[in-house]
């Protein structure tokens, strides 16, 4: 389930993250309750992206956060 940022307080969550090729522009940052949902969001975003920024696989990942909003681990999507 997709979460708003204010809903993430006190629970672990996964953030779907995509940066452009340069690493200067974040194209996606959405929070989900499961890793699979977050990975699916990244894949769907890339599949449907119509913008002008270049997306590379190493800048597409899912970041896991704990209940205190500390990053635990990053997971590759591609």
Question: Which residues fall in each region the model found?
Answer:
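Short, mixed-charge low-complexity intrinsically disordered segments
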Residues: 47-78
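Secondary-structure transition/turn motif
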Residues: 17-21, 32, 66, 75-78
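A short, exposed loop/beta-hairpin motif centered on an aromatic-Gly-Thr core
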Residues: 24-40
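Extended rod-forming repeat segments used as scaffolds/tethers
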Residues: 11, 37, 73-75
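Short aromatic-glycine-(Arg/Gly/Cys) micro-motifs in beta-strand/loop hairpins
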Residues: 1-26, 55
């Amino acid at each position: 389930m997709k979460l708003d940022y204010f809903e993430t307080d006190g629970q672990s969550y996964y953030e779907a993250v995509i940066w452009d090729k340069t690493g200067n522009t974040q194209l996606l940052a959405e929070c989900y309750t499961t890793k699979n949902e977050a990975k699916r969001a990244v894949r769907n975003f890339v599949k449907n992206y119509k913008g002008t920024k270049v997306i590379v696989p190493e800048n597409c990942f899912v970041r896991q956060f704990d209940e205190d909003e500390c990053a635990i681990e990053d997971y590759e999507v591609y």
